Regions:
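N-terminal secretory signal peptides and thylakoid transit peptides that target proteins
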Residues: 2-24
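C-terminal segment of classical bacterial N-terminal signal peptides
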Residues: 24-32
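Short, glycine-/small- and polar/acidic-enriched structural segments
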Residues: 36-162, 169-170, 186-192, 207, ...
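Secondary-structure end/capping motifs
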Residues: 229-308
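Sec/Tat-exported extracytoplasmic proteins
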Residues: 85, 90, 100, 139, ...
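Conserved C-terminal helix/tail region of periplasmic/extracytoplasmic solute-binding proteins
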Residues: 301-329
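Solvent-exposed, polar/charged alpha-helical surfaces in well-ordered, non-transmembrane soluble domains
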Residues: 79, 83, 133, 150-154, ...
């Protein structure tokens, strides 16, 4: 497998991107490593994430304090939670799976049904690459242990290719943005607000979207300690109810939400509205159920077949249904 994932070769690669973008730290901004105070929640988010949404919807006045920490990817959230620095986070099905395989102390407690059209493979606007098959031998950036590794694996397999047929380069989101912007990548598998940013700032073109390759399940995961602690458990339940209401507000007020998000992430409002109009499904937060567990099991089985993981994994012990009552409301 032709992959770069660290060490001298990766440092040399990134040297060509130096100064292009300010690289974000690997761990969350505002992260607190000490034990949480009673009822206090330490919550991870992405840039322009749940904090902004709750504030825009007028639902941020929680009766418990929240320490927000910003991360670029779900795998970093898993690492921070396993280190005792977070109570609650969310990401795709993939980061909790890899964390679980490595013994991380996390449990999946809720499921966001969300958009997959903003999960993409990007290429430069004037690139001759028109099909996934054209990626053979090309430099393709991705983020290991995230959706990008999963849907890129499936897209390549569909045209008879694998990671061994491309020059796959594992990069953090900020590093990938710098590499793509400076022409160090032929393609970039990426997600979220990085897509409109790359389109706006680097003239990116969407080669292929991940609709049809991903379930659209994004998993809230919590630390076992937070789940077992009554004040934090109650705070998480209340947080979930507020977020359900905020998602409904977002659906009813796309222009107001787009204006707030565009100002936060630094892209034109119309770019955000285009993403919202193109969403693959209405965003909502639902309880853990058997279908969601089966979906993550399918992900694990796909990675096993592709040789990404070495042995079969039963994901059921990763899941916790103790917030079902709060989420069912």
């Amino acid at each position: 497998m032709s992959q770069h994932s660290g060490g001298l070769s990766r440092r040399r690669f990134l040297a060509g991107c130096a100064g292009a973008l300010a690289l974000a730290p690997l761990l969350g901004h505002g992260l607190r490593a000490e034990a949480a105070a009673p009822g206090r929640l330490r919550v991870a988010q992405y840039k322009g994430g749940d904090r902004l949404l709750l504030e825009a919807a007028g639902l941020a006045d929680t009766p418990y304090p929240i320490d927000w920490a910003e991360f670029a990817s779900g795998n970093l959230m898993v690492e921070a939670m396993n280190g005792g620095s977070l109570d609650l986070a969310y990401g795709s099905e993939i980061p909790p799976l890899f964390g679980f395989i490595k013994g991380a102390r996390i449990r999946v407690v809720g499921v966001i049904k969300g958009d997959v059209n903003e999960q993409t493979v990007l290429v430069p606007k004037d690139s001759p690459i028109r099909l996934i098959a054209d990626l053979k031998g090309k430099r393709v950036g991705y983020v290991r242990a995230t959706t990008t590794q999963y849907y890129l694996t499936k897209m390549l397999a569909e045209v008879g290719l694998s990671f061994a047929d491309i020059e796959a380069i594992n990069l953090t989101v900020p590093d990938g943005a710098a590499a793509f912007r400076t022409g160090q990548l032929d393609a970039w598998a990426i997600y979220g607000y990085s897509v409109p940013l790359a389109q706006s700032n680097a003239g990116a073109r969407v080669l292929k979207r991940a609709n049809g390759y991903l379930s659209g399940n994004y998993l809230f995961f919590a630390s076992p300690e937070a789940i077992a602690d009554p004040p934090r458990h109650a705070a998480i339940a209340d947080f979930f109810v507020r977020l359900q209401k905020a998602f409904a507000w977002r659906q009813a007020n796309p222009e107001r939400y787009a204006a707030a998000l565009a100002a936060e992430i630094g892209v034109p409002v119309e770019a955000v509205l285009a993403l919202l109009r193109n969403e693959s499904q209405v965003r909502r937060l639902v309880p853990v159920d058997d279908a969601a567990i089966r979906s993550q099991q399918d992900v694990a089985d796909t990675f096993l077949k592709a040789g990404v993981i070495e042995r079969p994994v039963d994901v059921r012990p990763l899941w916790d249904g103790s917030f079902a009552a709060a989420l069912a409301g």
